[in-house]
């Protein structure tokens, strides 16, 4: 059976993926404990930045304790900064390989992130390359 928190999490992810200003009625009923669980789910699925992007400006989020809001925002921003840095490093490495005449085929990571409306909000831990 899917919980209220999981239902809210899925609604938030759907709102992120569709870039629609969703009517997130599921958030209104969440307790602080459920909000914490929602953020844990988001972190487990590497979607904390995406979830924060959707909920960060909602009245429901504004009602959470300052420390929780600050913690979620900090973790989301750190994730984004780390991803931007990893992406820049990857692009530099890819360019160097191409200058050496090596044409790598990017298998996932940056390619999969490009499917998201805001790719830097979906971190990837590594980039898989096929080098012929």
Regions found by a protein language model. Name each.
Residues 2-7, 18-108:
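Helical scaffold of the NTase/Pol beta-like nucleotidyltransferase catalytic core
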Residues 117-132:
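Catalytic metal-binding acidic patch
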Residues 111-113:
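Short, solvent-exposed loop/turn segments at secondary-structure junctions
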